[in-house]
């Protein structure tokens, strides 16, 4: 099974080797036909502390690195 890749924005880089990435997705409501924006936060591994708040990044699914980290930052958009 291929690993998922998501695009998002770094909203926090305060912790060592970890960034928090906010990923927004849009979908159409099945009944009301209105487009809705939903966001979710992911803790992603950043081994070199390279990314700062506001950076647009891609994250990929990986093996569990810690209790909350199962994503790794692969590159900047």
UniProtKB/Swiss-Prot annotation:
Species assigned in the record: Rickettsia bellii (strain OSU 85-389)
This protein's name: Small ribosomal subunit protein uS17
Phylogenetic classification of the source organism: Bacteria, Pseudomonadati, Pseudomonadota, Alphaproteobacteria, Rickettsiales
Stated family: Belongs to the universal ribosomal protein uS17 family.
UniProt keyword terms in alphabetical order: Ribonucleoprotein, Ribosomal protein, RNA-binding, rRNA-binding
GO BP terms in the entry: translation
Biological role: One of the primary rRNA binding proteins, it binds specifically to the 5'-end of 16S ribosomal RNA.
GO cellular component: cytosolic small ribosomal subunit
UniProt GO MF annotations: rRNA binding; structural constituent of ribosome
Pfam family for this entry, one: Ribosomal_S17
Gene3D superfamilies found in the cross-reference section: Nucleic acid-binding proteins
Quaternary structure note: Part of the 30S ribosomal subunit.
């Amino acid at each position: 099974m291929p690993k998922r890749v998501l695009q998002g924005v770094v909203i926090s880089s305060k912790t060592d080797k970890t960034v928090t990435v906010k990923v927004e997705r849009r979908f159409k409501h099945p009944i009301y036909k209105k487009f809705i924006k939903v966001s979710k936060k992911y803790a992603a591994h950043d081994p070199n502390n390279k990314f700062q708040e506001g950076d647009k990044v891609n994250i990929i699914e990986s093996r569990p690195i810690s209790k909350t980290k199962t994503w790794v930052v692969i590159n900047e958009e």
